Amino acid sequence: MMFAAPPEQSFEWSENGVESANKWLRTRLWNTIVDHLAGGALPTLDVASLSSEQKDLRRSVHETLAKCEDDFGRRLAFNTVVAAVMSLMNQVTKFEDSSGQGRAVVHEALTAAVLIMSPITPHICHTLWQMLGHGDIEIADWLPVDQSALEKSVVELAVQV
């Protein structure tokens, strides 16, 4: 129920909230990872050869990592951590690039989502982390934010004449 409100606010307990969180974990997180892994072996991520759509998803991954690192470490705002991962997972499920590099970027996104959610939902994340090909999530290092992934190659600028 950490996504329901900031820790300093009270909220009314709801079975619907528990059911919604369970449904999101099962359908959005678990099923997305299972479907992704069913695609077979993954190539190594080659940042230099990414398309603009792949770069956009990768930017979202690293923006989410940076935001959640701040939310966990400084702000203790667990509800915004969950919201950020939900937003990232929405982008992942809408991403339709099944090329090798597209799948590699999705793998990076799913790895980040599981690692971010692990302090909040440790049991399911432990299993998903191992399914993604890693060891024990309890001893995993936080993923570093790639500053180059945060750079935008095209910026829209409105100019009034």
Predicted regions and their residues:
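Long, charged, mostly alpha-helical binding arms that flank functional sites
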Residues: 1-104, 147-149
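Basic, alpha-helical terminal appendages of large translation-related enzymes
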Residues: 10-15, 93-104, 108-161
